[in-house]
Design a protein with these regions (language model features):
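Conserved, mostly hydrophobic/aromatic
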Residues: 61, 125, 368, 438, ...
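Feature activates predominantly on carbohydrate-active enzymes
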Residues: 99-275, 293, 345-349, 359-377, ...
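Structured mid-domain segments that build the active-site/substrate or prosthetic-cofactor binding neighborhood
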Residues: 213, 218-221, 227, 370-376, ...
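Extracytoplasmic
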Residues: 623-827
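Catalytic domains of carbohydrate-active enzymes that cleave complex glycans
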Residues: 467-695, 700-708, 719-721, 736
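Contiguous, structured surface segment used for ligand recognition
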Residues: 19-170
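Gly/Pro-rich turn-and-neighbor structural signature
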Residues: 159, 231-234, 239-242, 269-390, ...
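Bacterial Sec-dependent N-terminal signal peptides
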Residues: 1-24
Length: 827
């Protein structure tokens, strides 16, 4: 069979742009080292995480070659020498001689180098060595996602190493990890079906740890809704340490204790109230530190309310200071070392940020973890002064969320470009010590995890263009160029469509049925599904499971959901005039509802032979509030009608002009900046922003040109609608501003996000609607003369403003969710 997966170029290409250059080949050539009959040597004193990685290398070698190989031999005579600085004497000698000098004093760095007729994998520390081993296996063709996304492994007769030295340097972010969260019902059911337990035991976590390490991560917050990592299986912590993964506990689980350890024993521990129950809670905290003593684990400090809630209605800074002081005293007493010798993190999540804003400060060695707003936008960044803190800053980012205005648990709704833009923002403003990603059930967030981990290694490798190329490289690591290119485009397009409105927020009222907007968006998904199916037919059987999980299922599931709600909208619209065609649309709703269940069932029981049974049982149809507290997916309401015997200069159209922000007439950029177009980012096309955000905006401007001569009506003013991304005031300036002026007239100042805050009185009236829709629409009214050609100028006064669309209304514009189809344009 002619294969289209795993071309030589594809194997050589690595998933992340941060990886070292290709060095594994499958055909002999000049200046290569053969691994035919290779053996491996390493010091028995190596940390268990290195020895585990070597064991995986041996297994991977056998998977690729089909032969038992890489037998271990003593001493330093193996074909492959693996070792860590300070542990392996031969490695230390090479460092001293200058062969591996670039490892000295480095963190988590590896060097892969041919020295004589040996291949050396050396690490500056234990994780550096592990990362070097997994870089080799990845280039051999074993994807980090071989287990979690069923990436097939192609066999080769022989393996060759191009002679030279290879590395990808040190990580830019010190702690790079995942948070398993909101794990019921999907992950919990899958674990029960797969491992036979009602909790995540060490067999499950071993799979998670291996994925993290193969992605060059080093950190995990374990699942905590109903599970207790430490208490459920004592082997969990042991395996984490053996594999070299640093553990922590989530933002509301202080002192290395899982919340379930308290929740299951409330009678023993008493009220979760430090003012009234200090003695018991201190004892609870102390046990956590005693258990993690001697590990690399990171201790969460501070305290939130019982069960991921606020501790009180107001920020009691004095109480929080007391709690943190006592926690640090316990850390010092238990470890026998100053508290600053144990890495600690304080998470400014939701209401906890109020403590910081109210003036509470923690010791300088404590890392401060900033959060996004659960919808992918950074809430705030440290000031220039704050960035100098010894403890540094971290970011807690979400691609899964349970909470208002609506859960996002079923599918990945995070745009690649949004994650890139916001993580770049975070890094540029000094958030560089910890990045942790809330991934829900882990699946189906495979690609966001890959991008997050790759960016955490070196964010500066990424630009607007290269982040789009990253998606292509991700699929090219599995398929040939033609298939990978189409798969990447389908994936990115689906992310763009998903970000318009989440599946949980989507309903019959979302889009305008009268203007044709609903038909347009449903057609968008129908065309995308057809593309996805056509591509599926071109993929060999052994590589289809990966494609079904990451591309085909999400597209089909959403295309069907759009069909269902479009049919419901048509049914309700036609039923108001007693049109009997409403009944046909009612039947369509029922068909789509049933198809949704069949698609999910196929994911659970058919993909990879039923390997992922339980992963796709999340409710997503029937939300009425933020939570999924309804029994099961609910058939949307329909009406039945009784049947008896018995429809870059723009030209105005229909009384308005709609312009994509990308289609400007001209631009002006300040010194050191440029206007950057983010593809796939807007509601309908793209978005535009002045970059970098760290530079002064100066006199930067966007100019648009339009012709109103086709309008017969008389008017003295125009209403200009400016649509921007719902960026938060991350600089804490009192809101970001831009100006709008017409034909050189007096500019009007617009502050678009001053009230975009998650607290009263703006939470329900402005914040939730804006973040759910992901855009802010502001309207200004400007005087106009009756000439034909007009020029509109928009000037940002603050950095970080992302423009999506502009509508100039001369009296004919009707409000639409996607702000109307773009007007006719000439260039």
């Amino acid at each position: 069979m002619k294969k289209v997966l795993f071309s030589l170029l594809a194997i050589m290409a690595t998933l992340g742009s941060a990886a070292s250059e290709p060095f594994v080949f499958f055909q002999a050539s000049a200046d290569v080292l053969s691994l035919q009959g290779a053996s491996v040597s390493f010091d028995s004193r190596e940390h268990s995480c290195v020895q585990r990685a070597v064991a995986n290398l041996q297994k991977d070698f056998e998977k690729v070659t089909g032969k038992t190989g890489l037998s271990r031999i003593s001493g330093e005579s193996g074909t492959i020498i693996i070792g860590t600085v300070g542990v392996n004497k031969q490695i230390d000698q090479w460092v001293k001689k200058g062969e591996l000098r670039d490892l000295k004093g480095k963190t988590e760095k590896y060097i892969i180098k041919t020295i004589g007729d040996q291949l050396v994998i050396a690490g500056s520390d234990k994780r550096g060595t592990v990362f070097g081993i997994y870089e080799l296996t990845k280039q051999m063709g074993v994807s980090p996602w071989y287990y979690w996304a069923d990436v097939p492994i192609e066999q080769h007769e022989a393996l060759y190493i191009k002679k030279g030295e290879y590395t990808d340097g040190e990580p830019s972010v010190r702690y790079r990890g995942l948070f398993l969260n909101d794990e019921a019902p999907c992950l919990t059911t899958w674990v029960k079906n797969t491992f036979g337990t009602n909790y995540g035991d060490h067999r499950f976590y071993e799979k998670v740890f291996e994925l993290i390490l193969r992605l060059k991560g080093n950190f995990l917050w374990p699942a905590m809704w109903g599970w207790a990592f430490y208490a459920d299986d004592p082997e969990n912590l042991k395996v984490a340490d053996e594999m070299g993964v640093i553990m922590g506990t989530s933002h509301h689980e202080p002192m290395a204790r899982n919340h379930q350890e308290y929740a299951r024993n409330r009678n023993k521990w008493g009220a979760w109230n430090y003012q009234t129950n200090k003695e018991n809670l201190d004892r609870f905290f102390r046990e956590g530190i005693e258990r993690m003593k001697g590990t690399d684990d990171i201790v969460t400090i501070g305290m939130r309310g019982d069960g991921d809630e606020a501790m009180s209605e107001t920020a009691d800074t004095k109480l929080m200071e007391t709690i943190i002081d006592n926690q640090r005293r316990i850390i010092k007493e238990v470890t026998g070392k100053p508290a600053e010798k144990t890495t600690q993190v304080w998470a400014l999540y939701k209401e906890v940020q109020d403590y910081y804003d109210a003036g509470l400060r923690v010791p300088d060695d404590v890392m401060i973890l900033i959060s996004d707003d659960n919808w992918g936008d950074i809430r705030r960044v440290p000031t220039a002064t704050e960035r100098s803190r010894k403890g540094g800053w971290g970011i807690y980012y979400h691609v899964d969320y349970v909470g208002a205005p609506r859960n996002t648990k079923w599918l990945n709704v995070t745009q690649t470009q949004q994650m890139f833009e916001q993580l770049s923002l975070a890094y540029d403003f000094g958030i560089q010590r910890m990045w942790i990603l809330n991934v829900g059930d882990l699946k189906p967030m495979e690609y966001p995890i890959q991008l997050f981990m790759d960016m955490a290694w070196n964010p500066k490798d990424y630009t607007v263009q290269t982040v789009t190329d990253h998606t292509l490289r991700f699929f090219r690591s599995v398929y040939d160029d033609a298939i990978a290119t189409e798969a990447a485009d389908i994936y990115n397009r689906n992310c763009q469509y998903m970000a318009r409105v989440t599946p949980e927020m989507l309903d019959a009222r979302t889009y305008n049925i009268k203007t044709g907007e609903w038909r347009q968006v449903a057609d968008d998904y129908q065309r995308l599904e057809l593309r996805a199916l056509r591509l599926y037919d071109q993929i060999p059987a052994e590589a289809r499971d990966f494609y079904r999980q990451l591309v085909l299922f999400p597209v089909q599931a959403m295309a069907n959901l759009y069909d269902m709600y479009y049919a419901q909208a048509m049914n309700l619209h036609l039923a108001t005039s007693n049109n009997p065609d409403a009944n046909l649309w009612a039947d369509k709703v029922k068909q789509c509802f049933r198809r949704d269940s069949l698609l999910c069932a196929a994911y659970n029981t058919d993909i990879a032979g039923g390997k992922w049974n339980g992963m796709m049982i999340q409710k997503h149809i029937g939300y009425r509030s933020w939570n999924d507290n309804f029994r099961a997916d609910m058939l949307p309401r329909v009406r039945t009608v009784p049947v008896s015997d018995g429809g870059y200069t723009f030209e105005a159209k229909d009384g308005y002009v709609a312009m994509e922000a990308e289609h400007y007439y001209s631009t002006t950029a300040s010194e050191g900046t440029k206007w950057t177009v983010y593809p796939y980012y807007g509601r309908t096309r793209s978005a535009v922003a002045l970059t970098p955000y760290t530079a002064a905006v100066g006199n930067a401007a966007l100019t648009y040109r339009f012709n109103l001569s086709t309008l017969n009506s008389q008017f003295s003013t125009l209403k200009v609608h400016v649509v921007t991304k719902s960026t938060l005031d991350f600089l804490d300036t009192g809101g970001f501003e831009y100006t709008v002026s017409l034909d050189g007239g007096e500019p009007q100042v617009v502050n678009f996000n001053k009230t975009l805050v998650d607290r009263q009185p703006y939470m329900y009236s402005e914040y939730y609607p804006a973040v759910a829709r992901r855009v802010v629409e502001k309207v200004v009214e400007l005087p106009v003369t009756q000439k034909e050609i007009h020029t509109l100028t928009i000037q940002p006064k603050h950095p970080g403003i992302v423009f999506e669309k502009i509508i100039v209304d001369a009296g004919g514009y009707q409000s639409q969710y996607l702000f109307g189809e773009e007007s006719p344009v000439k260039r």
